[in-house]
Structures are given as structure tokens and as C-alpha cells.
Amino acid sequence: AATDVGVAVVEVLRVFTNPGDSILLSSPVYQNFYNWINETKLNLVDVPFERTGNESANPWVINWDGIEKAYASGLKVHILCSPHNPLGRMYTKEELLRIVALAKRYDVLVISDEIHAPLTFKGNTFVPMLSLGNDAESVSVTVTAASKGWNIAGLKCAIIVSQNEAINSRLATMPMAVHYRASLLGAFATAIAFSEGEIWLDSVIENLDHNRHMLKDLLNSQLPSVRYHIPDNSYLAWLDLEKLNLGADPAA
């Protein structure tokens, strides 16, 4: 356990990396990942998603050539945001297995941040990294929490999950203070949320489903030049404002 997913990621990185090691992200991605990488003094390798321009399907595709090139360069860790924040993109089983195969070939640890998984909309399938068998277990650590799905971030409890003996042995070297700082109330709330919180979560997802389609309709009618792909997961909206011609510094 840890106080939150950010602390969990940082502490896992401290166990498995040294300052100066390389770590992979795929942008656009949650801003705090960059803060965690700076905190652990790692070198960022960014392999951005590529946009297909096809709005009828998932417009964000993985740059596999870029991913393998990064892995082959001596990469230590790949942080996978699954489901992806802020794109609302789901990874397929085939994509995850391909990442696992690369991680085994190049001896890379995959940290799978699955905090947004409970907020998956009906008709989409979330695939946990650790559900994919022994190979996935041997190359990955999962971090997650009930904080996004059940809105209990303030209760300060996250989960670090491994199903591999060698990885568990290394995680056991983590300072015990990391676990002790997690909230006892948060631990109980997390257990109850995951085991008994389905009715409440279903109602939240229903509201979010309405909101994501309402936003699409509003943009189509009021700001048709703004591109928005309806996400498959969570409450985030990633809007492409390029055609508004706001300039290089829109906040200025």
C-alpha cells in the first residue's frame, strides 16, 4: 500500500532504477508523471501517440517502431497509463501482449497505472496487465486505487500489486514507512468500494456517459472546429483547439 498512486510509482521507481536511467512515457499524458520522473532523477523518453485523423474509431495509435527503438536503447522502465489519461483510450489485449513481449526481450519493467479502470464505459473492455499470464507477471507491477472511481482521493490509499516472486522480493526492500503512511480509513474504504460499491459506480458511469455525449453535441453545434473524440473511459475530455488559431501561447 501507499498513500496514493503517485507515491506508489515514485517508490517503485526508487526500487527498480538509479538516477540517470531512462524511462518511457507516451504523451499526451497526465502531467504528474513528469514530476515523478524528475523526483527520481530519471531521463525521459517520450514516444507520443500518433493521431490517425479517423474520428469514427480510436484516433490515437501506438508508435510501435518508436516504442521498440526506446526499449532497445537500454530503457529501464515503461510507465503505462492504462486506461490512458487524458485520452480515455483503452489498450487491447493484443497491444498489451505486444508490450509484454518487448519488455521480456529487452528486460524492461512495465509499471501499469490502472487507476481509471473502474470508470470504463459499457461496450468497452478493460484488460488488467496482470491478467495476461506468467510473462506479464514477470515484467510488470500494477498500481491502482479506488480514488478515481469512487471519488475518495482524500482518504489516501493506493495499492501496489505484483504476482511475481522476484519482483516481490525487490518490492520488499521498499521502506515500511511507505506502507504505514497509507490511511487506515482509506484502506477500509478501498476494500468496501471494490467489493460493494458497484451500484454507486454504475450510477456515476451512467452520468459520465451522458456528459461525454452532451459535450460532443455542444461542440458540434457551438464550436464545430474543435475536435473531440468521445472517450472510452473516465471523466476527462481531450479537446483539439488547433483550428481556433489561438497562437503559440494561447494563455497569453
What do these predicted ranges mean?
Residues 2-252:
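PLP-dependent class I/II
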